């Protein structure tokens, strides 16, 4: 019997047309999005909370609705299915094309489900994206909240973490005082809005602290900060070598702290069209060597392009 997730030739043709349509700058219809979300939920519901990922692959950080820069990212990193991708979350909000961005991400997931992993970020949550742009954008482009509701249902099915070759732990935010073993992530019910505290919250909200050891109160109001000693203990007890995460704007697109064992990757250049930062993607080869590629914003019209420094902590 054929797998429920196996695409028919007709499905493949439809998805390929949708991908081409999106790349041409058109949005999908409501009915196309409804069908896409149904297929995506079927695929994602088969994935565990922690995805075991093989190298080679390319790890990418926040995208935040910067659709032109996502297209540029694929130009630089290589198109699917020739390149395997792991995205660390935050596909929506802030940027002006979150609808196109997440439509493309889901279309690629449905088309090449074994070639792309989409983790959940803290913005893949109703409470956040109703305020920071995604809800308003959906309403503006479709005239109702139906599409927003369909997309936000999918968010609950996105996995929470990944481990590359049993050595690199990946999550959107980071560590939690509630987690000694990564196996605890397996027990979570992820199909829900992100709680305000606890392990699931912390995985998507926490940040590394460069200068202090131990756990600290996060200035974000959710999650924690964690020091180098916490990283060392976590890696040792779970037989891991590194942590890769996103969640924080870093001006060069990548930042390594905690003796280079905690890596922050940010893939939205000139964040919010004003921050002046570079973006970065990180290729991991079969020997787990990392090759970072930094890039500037894709050329586009009618968007401000100014440079200014912003605080380290940006929701």
From Swiss-Prot:
Keyword Flavoprotein set for record: no
Modified residues (Leucine methyl ester): 315
Name the UniProt record assigns to this protein: Serine/threonine-protein phosphatase PP2A catalytic subunit 3
UniProt keyword annotations, A-Z: Hydrolase, Manganese, Metal-binding, Methylation, Protein phosphatase
Species of provenance: Paramecium tetraurelia
Entry EC no(s): 3.1.3.16
Residues that, per the record, bind Mn(2+) 1: 62, 64, 90
Matching CDD domains: MPP_PP2A_PP4_PP6 (cd07415)
Biased composition (Basic and acidic residues): 298-315
Cofactor info, note text: Binds 2 manganese ions per subunit.
Post-translational modification: Reversibly methyl esterified on Leu-315 by leucine carboxyl methyltransferase 1 (PPM1) and protein phosphatase methylesterase 1 (PPE1). Carboxyl methylation influences the affinity of the catalytic subunit for the different regulatory subunits, thereby modulating the PP2A holoenzyme's substrate specificity, enzyme activity and cellular localization.
GO biological process, one term: mitotic cell cycle
